[in-house]
Amino acid sequence: MAELATIARPYAEALFRVAEGGDIAAWSTLVQELAQVARLPEVLSVASSPKVTRAQVAELLLAALKSPLAAGAEAKNFVQMLVDNHRIALLPEIAEQFEALKNEREGAADAEIVSAFPLDGADLDSLVASLERKFKRKLKPTVEVDSSLIGGVRVTVGDEVLDTSVRARLASMQAALTA
């Protein structure tokens, strides 16, 4: 996975530089759409077929997009470059790295919150507000429920993990008692 990230990084950075000259949010939507299309096994199959020309693959990808940017020269050139270099399968990773660059520019970060119980609006807002103070940046939360945590939450922001779950505390106590 690390090597995919290494290969995808220059593409994401180049696209982000293009996006900085316009609407970054619109480019983010475009790259997310491209990533969704590239995840389809049928698209990867067509892209690797020797019977289909590179221009046809690029046209197929662009035709599947709803974004108005897809008609622009920059988007067409980007897609054609990916097709020519056999990098269509990298689009999900490129999209992920593009989002990371966008978040960095906005002073924001994605936060993965795993809770033992479902979080409703007020509880989630309160938790996100306190996490934003702790991490000193705007967070974009995604919430999952995992009852095996027993209680509490586990929050992942970038490479930082804050685990206040009962399961983690029990594991810590067990480690302390057996040491």
Curated annotation (Swiss-Prot):
Q: InterPro entries per the record? A: ATP_synth_OSCP/delta_N_sf, ATPase_OSCP/dsu
The record's function comment reads:
F(1)F(0) ATP synthase produces ATP from ADP in the presence of a proton or sodium gradient. F-type ATPases consist of two structural domains, F(1) containing the extramembraneous catalytic core and F(0) containing the membrane proton channel, linked together by a central stalk and a peripheral stalk. During catalysis, ATP synthesis in the catalytic domain of F(1) is coupled via a rotary mechanism of the central stalk subunits to proton translocation.
Location of the protein in the cell: Cell inner membrane
Q: Could you name the domain of life of the organism this protein comes from?
A: Bacteria
Task: Fetch the PANTHER family from UniProt.
Answer: ATP SYNTHASE DELTA CHAIN (PTHR11910)
Family of the protein in this entry: Belongs to the ATPase delta chain family.
Q: Which ranges form a coiled coil?
A: none
Name by which UniProt lists this protein: ATP synthase subunit delta
Q: How does it sit in the membrane?
A: Peripheral membrane protein
State the Pfam families in the record.
OSCP (PF00213)
| Keywords for this protein | ATP synthesis, Cell inner membrane, Cell membrane, CF(1), Hydrogen ion transport, Ion transport, Membrane, Transport
Source organism per UniProt: Burkholderia multivorans (strain ATCC 17616 / 249)
One Gene Ontology molecular-function label: proton-transporting ATP synthase activity, rotational mechanism
GO CC annotation: plasma membrane; proton-transporting ATP synthase complex
Principal location class: membrane
User: Could you give the subunit structure recorded for this chain?
Assistant: F-type ATPases have 2 components, F(1) - the catalytic core - and F(0) - the membrane proton channel. F(1) has five subunits: alpha(3), beta(3), gamma(1), delta(1), epsilon(1). F(0) has three main subunits: a(1), b(2) and c(10-14). The alpha and beta chains form an alternating ring which encloses part of the gamma chain. F(1) is attached to F(0) by a central stalk formed by the gamma and epsilon chains, while a peripheral stalk is formed by the delta and b chains.
